[in-house]
Amino acid sequence: MLKKVYYFLIFLFIVACSSSDDGKSEAKTVSLIVDGAFDDKGFNESSSKAIRKLKADLNINIIEKASTGNSYLGDIANLEDGNSNLIWGIGFRLSDILFQRASENVSVNYAIIEGVYDEIQIPKNLLNISFRSEEVAFLAGYFASKASKTGKIGFVGGVRGKVLESFMYGYEAGAKYANSNIKVVSQYVGTFGDFGLGRSTASNMYRDGVDIIFAAAGLSGIGVIEAAKELGPDHYIIGVDQDQSYLAPNNVIVSAVKKVDSLMYSLTKKYLETGVLDGGKTMFLGLKEDGLGLVLNENLKSNYSEIYNKSLKIGQSIMNGIIKVPYDKVSYDNFVLQMEN
């Protein structure tokens, strides 16, 4: 009898251990790879906040990796080997490698923010999220043009490409829409990771009479903000990707935000609950879909609330289709031509 009890207890122990192991194996793993650094005070930082909130709320495993061009393939392979169920990529520079990995590795799901896939069929296990960045950039340009005291505003971009061009042309179009005589100085620094270069580029612009700069350049853009802080009053910034007013409360007037964190959170949560990724396509988000927004710095509200409210009305015209915002050189040239006629 004792022998039977002994074997029964062993059986229960084995079953309990197996159940415990099964519970652990059921925990999903969501990974995040970004181009550059996580502490960019913008796009990458927002994505990190989203995935960490998912971990806290849903008790999942997460893996975060900051990467650069030559390391993309190896870093993504490591995420795949880490039993990732879903791998998020942040930034257009990851477009090609994520397309390749999704095509070759159908057992893993992938999603990318701002992938560039023109007229290409995306694999079913890859979801691309693309923002109509030109729309919020148009509002930023309109605001800057109305707020400028010198009649000269600037744009500093990181690496030139389709996404950054939509920012630049949208910004320039909005500025011209507000004031056809405004002068817009646009410059790319060629990197998202050079604080010093962003700082010196902005300093030169300010010295040349620019009083408001819209910076879409990652860590290089933080250098632009630093230049405005150092130069003091009358040197202003339009923030990007998230509300950046906390970085320079006296200089960042408004921010052109992309709601990356809330979007990533909701899409990932849905995937984890259903086990289904609605991939094989690009999801386009703009002002109408509440994927973008212009946020006013509360510290400067008394000085700029009127211009801000006018900018929001322009946003309504964009959402209603009254204003067609340009996103590249051809559409921008046509936009300017129509304004002149």
From Swiss-Prot:
Positions bound to adenosine: 35, 114, 192, 218, 241, 258
Signal peptide per UniProt: 1-16
Function: Binds adenosine and inosine but not guanosine, xanthosine or ribose. May be part of an ABC-type nucleoside uptake system involved in the purine salvage pathway. Other probable members of the ABC transporter system are substrate binding proteins BmpB, BmpA and BmpC (BB_0382, BB_0383 and BB_0384 respectively), ATP transporter RbsA and 2 permeases (BB_0677, BB_0678 and BB_0679 respectively).
Lipid-bearing positions (S-diacylglycerol cysteine): 17
Record's subunit section: Monomer.
CDD domains from the UniProt entry: PBP1_PrnA-like
Entry's family note: Belongs to the BMP lipoprotein family.
Keyword line: Cell inner membrane, Cell membrane, Lipoprotein, Membrane, Palmitate, Signal, Transport
Subcellular localization, as worded in the UniProt entry: Cell inner membrane
Organism per entry: Borreliella burgdorferi (strain ATCC 35210 / DSM 4680 / CIP 102532 / B31)
GO cellular component entries: plasma membrane
Annotated membrane topology: Lipid-anchor
Main location: membrane
Lipid-binding residues (covalent, N-palmitoyl cysteine): 17
Further details from the record: Human sera from 3 Lyme borreliosis patients are positive for this antigen, as were mice injected with this protein. However, BmpD immunization does not confer protection against B.burgdorferi infection in female C3H/HeN mice.
Protein name: Basic membrane protein D
